[in-house]
Amino acid sequence: MWLGLRLFHRPFSSLAARGLVYEKHGEPLQVLRLKNVNITHPADNEVRVKMLAAPINPSDINMVQGTYALLPQLPAVGGNEGVGVVVEIGRHVSSMRPGDWVVPVDAGLGTWCTEAVFSEDSLVRVPSDIPVAGAATVSVNPCTAYRLLSDFETLRPGDTIIQNASNSGVGQAVIQIATSLGITTINVVRDREDLSSLIQRLRDLGADHVITEEQLRKPEMKDLFKNCPRPRLALNCVGGKSTTEMLRHLDYGGTMVTYGGMSKQPVTVPVSALIFKNVKLCGFWVTQWKKERAQTDREEIVKMIRDLCDLIRRGKLVPPPSTQRPLEDFSRALQDSQTPFLSRKQILIM
């Protein structure tokens, strides 16, 4: 829960901030307003954070629209991800101090603001020697990619995975993390006018094979597996026909994990894949994973963020191409974030 939202009154002890507030669900450009909000000094287990940067993700849009699986109480400040610097701590806070960089690990906290007050256990420290854009975008897509590669199959150097939506934020993170582990990636993308430049960009990130949805359906796919083993793991963010085609190429006993449904089409599984190939089907939602681990093993969240930041520091995990805009220019950023085939991440600078 975002703890600093005070829209109508400003007590003597409160502090002024600005945030993108919505009082009802709807299209972001219609319901979001940049407003002055009031935040209080932190209580014993709270932290006041000056936000530095916060991206616009599809889940942020869905939350404002009211279609996401987790919805904050209204009125609310938008944004689930970002990086900020600690400016004040409550007297019982022990894991961070003023000057530390922090990122949220809970969803629905409201990061599209200049300052906010969060509970200590909803934040994790990150190093301040990595790029702001990397820190601001580390806690959603890279965390999803990290868990997809860690939790469903025991992957070793030389193994292969296949994924669709490979140019998405998660897809790009999967490519880079897999490359750092010596895992071969087969990356499926939609055909488009700038296909050659997209293929080159993904190869620059470490992609071994980049193919289109149409190529995925062709018999010539068998030639690809002369040079690499069939994938043990398939990562699905699309659904529909793309899912069925990836399943055809999955190795015996392999696993397909669905973490999104961009096509809004159901996952269709041939009976033969279940009976004769013994494939396993799973779903994954990083928000739920974090919620469960926060209660049982918070150190696993901290380790994941630490590992990802180390990859960023070593240049093995770069954030997606981005356009950074001041908070006041949020309308342009929101519009561009929903433009098809515009692959640049929109990041709000506070």
Curated annotation (Swiss-Prot):
InterPro entries reported for this sequence: ADH-like_C, ADH-like_N, GroES-like_sf, Mito_Enoyl-ACP_Reductase, NAD(P)-bd_dom_sf, PKS_ER
Claim: NADP is one of the keywords in the record: yes
Transit peptide: 1-12
Catalytic site: Y68
Gene Ontology CC annotations of this record: mitochondrion
Record: residues binding NADP(+): 141, 167-170, 190-192, 259-262, 284-286, 345
Primary location: mitochondrion
Record lineage: Eukaryota, Metazoa, Chordata, Craniata, Vertebrata
Taxonomy, superkingdom: Eukaryota
Subcellular location: Mitochondrion
Stated role: Catalyzes the NADPH-dependent reduction of trans-2-enoyl thioesters in mitochondrial fatty acid synthesis (fatty acid synthesis type II). Fatty acid chain elongation in mitochondria uses acyl carrier protein (ACP) as an acyl group carrier, but the enzyme accepts both ACP and CoA thioesters as substrates in vitro. May provide the octanoyl chain used for lipoic acid biosynthesis, regulating protein lipoylation and mitochondrial respiratory activity. Involved in iron homeostasis; affecting Fe-S cluster assembly and ceramide metabolism.
Gene3D superfamilies per record: Medium-chain alcohol dehydrogenases, catalytic domain, NAD(P)-binding Rossmann-like Domain
Protein name stated in the entry: Enoyl-[acyl-carrier-protein] reductase, mitochondrial
Gene coding for it: mecr
GO BP terms: fatty acid biosynthetic process; pronephric nephron tubule development
Enzyme nomenclature, EC number: 1.3.1.104
Chemical reaction(s) catalysed: a 2,3-saturated acyl-[ACP] + NADP(+) = a (2E)-enoyl-[ACP] + NADPH + H(+)
Tissue-level expression: Expressed in the developing pronephros.
Keywords, ordered alphabetically: Developmental protein, Fatty acid biosynthesis, Fatty acid metabolism, Lipid biosynthesis, Lipid metabolism, Mitochondrion, NADP, Oxidoreductase, Transit peptide
Subunit details: Homodimer.
Family according to the record: Belongs to the zinc-containing alcohol dehydrogenase family. Quinone oxidoreductase subfamily.
Gene Ontology MF, one: enoyl-[acyl-carrier-protein] reductase (NADPH) activity
